Curated annotation (Swiss-Prot):
Its cofactor is Mg(2+). The lineage of its organism: Bacteria, Pseudomonadati, Pseudomonadota, Gammaproteobacteria, Lysobacterales. Homodimer. It comes from Xylella fastidiosa (strain Temecula1 / ATCC 700964). Substrate binds at residues 8-13, 70, 154-157, 177, 182-183. This is dITP/XTP pyrophosphatase. GO terms for biological process: nucleotide metabolic process; purine nucleoside triphosphate catabolic process. Keywords: Hydrolase, Magnesium, Metal-binding, Nucleotide metabolism, Nucleotide-binding. It catalyses: XTP + H2O = XMP + diphosphate + H(+); dITP + H2O = dIMP + diphosphate + H(+); ITP + H2O = IMP + diphosphate + H(+). It holds the Pfam family Ham1p_like. It is an enzyme of class 3 (hydrolase).
Length: 199
């Protein structure tokens, strides 16, 4: 069984990725189990940040690495918080503060103009100098609620409302969320490549 390092220190993200990859015959190990710390995300795009994280994990562990970068894109805010989703309200990262800041920024934006999407890109590097990384992305369309609702998930989940299901991401069960989320869609696109990778 091949070993794959998940290049993330985010426990919520790590749990989601592990759950979604449960059926794949890989030994998945978090980078923290190797003593690897998060690397600064200095890229200008989600893809660049995912590559930076995957390359760092490969260099530090000697194993193939899977990394994702994701964020919330709000049309009424010109794409913010975008790349800065985790640090929107400043550092250290604080989900409740991020949610509060976003709701404040949208205070005067009416229903129907609060369109948003979660976007994720997932990168798989076979080794640190892999010239042909496997890259997949996924998007989850929704809108920003007027107040937090639900206790599941993490990050912006309490204020990200999916009109098709009539609930926020935080109100969804993990099974549903892990089928329709931006990460789930990106992983689904990467799944065939993972089977080739394992061969």
């Amino acid at each position: 069984m091949k070993k794959l390092v998940l290049a993330s220190g985010n426990a919520g993200k790590l749990g989601e990725l592990r759950a979604m990859l449960a059926g794949v015959a890989l030994q998945i190990t978090a980078q923290g189990e190797f003593g690897v710390q998060d690397v600064p995300e200095t890229g200008l795009t989600f893809i660049e940040n995912a590559l930076i994280k995957a390359r760092h994990a490969c260099l530090m562990t000697g194993f193939p690495a899977l990394a994702d970068d994701s964020g919330l894109i709000v049309d009424a805010l010109g794409g913010a918080p975008g790349l800065y989703s985790a640090r929107y309200a400043g550092t250290p990262t604080d989900a409740a503060a991020n949610n509060a800041k976003l709701l404040e920024m949208l205070r005067d934006v009416p229903a129907g103009r609060r369109c948003a999407r979660f976007y994720a890109v997932i990168v798989l590097l076979r080794h640190a100098e892999d010239p042909q990384p496997l890259i997949a992305d996924g998007c989850w369309e929704g809108e920003i609620a007027f107040e937090p609702c639900g206790s599941g998930g993490f990050g912006y989940n309490p204020i990200f409302f999916d009109p098709l299901y009539g609930m926020t991401a935080a109100q969804m069960g993990a099974e549903l969320k892990n089928k329709i989320s931006h990460r789930a869609r990106a992983l689904e696109r990467l799944r065939d490549c993972l089977h080739t990778f394992m061969a």
